[in-house]
C-alpha cells in the first residue's frame, strides 16, 4: 500500500527480451507515475544487451524526450533522474550533462556497476555481469567528480557505488554528491548500516570543519576527478 508520507522512487530499466526498450521506459512511467515521488531512468545496467547504447547522444535525446512527454501527462509530473555507467569517456559525460540540462532533469545518479574486470583481484573468476561493492568505489567516485566539474555543481548528483561506511559516504559527498545510495553493503550488513554511516559521517564532518553536508559537497571534486 502506498504511504503518502514515504518517499518512493522507481528505478526504470528494460528487460532483456524487450522489443521496444525506448517505449517500455515510457509505458512503465505512465503506469506507475501517479504512485511514486520520483523516477530514475536506468540506461546503465551491463546485464541488458544494448541498454548502454542509450548513452549515445542521439538515442539518449530520443529516450529522454519521450519520457518527459509522458511525465508531463501525469496528474502531477515527478522529478526524473538518469543513472549512468562508470565506464564512460569524458566526451560522453559532457553530452549527458548537456542533455540533463537541456531537458531539465532532476539530476544524475552516478554510477551503476562496471564491466571493468581489472577492478578485481582475480579477473579470471568473472567474465560477465557488473562489478559492484567496494571494488567499484574509486572508479564510480571519479566519474561522479568529473560530472560535478562538467556541470559546475549546478546539477544535483546522487553518489552510488561501493559505499559501506561514513568515510565512503564522505568521499562521495566531497566528489559532488548531495545524496547517497546503498545496495551491496546494505544487503550484506542490513538496515543498521544506515545509522552507523550517519554516526561516522557526523564525526568526519566535525573533524574536517564542516557545519553540514552542504558545505562539503564538491569540496574535493578536482582531486577525485583526476585520481
Identify the role of each PLM range.
Residues 1-104, 117-120:
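Active-site entrance/lid segments in N-terminal catalytic domains of soluble metabolic enzymes
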Residues 8-12, 39-42, 80-84, 108-110, ...:
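Hydrophobic faces of well-ordered beta-strands that scaffold small-molecule active sites
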Residues 26, 88-102, 148-153, 163-180:
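Catalytic cores of alpha/beta
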Residues 43-45, 107-115, 169-196:
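Glycine-rich phosphate-binding active-site loops on the catalytic face of alpha/beta enzymes
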Residues 46-55, 93, 99-153:
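Glycine/Thr-rich beta-alpha phosphate-binding loop at enzyme active sites
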Residues 71, 151, 201, 205:
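Conserved hydrophobic residues forming the short capping helix/wall of the S-adenosyl-L-methionine
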Residues 117-133, 186-210:
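C-terminal helical cap(s) of enzyme catalytic domains, especially alpha/beta-barrels
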Residues 137, 199-227:
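Extended, intrinsically disordered, low-complexity segments
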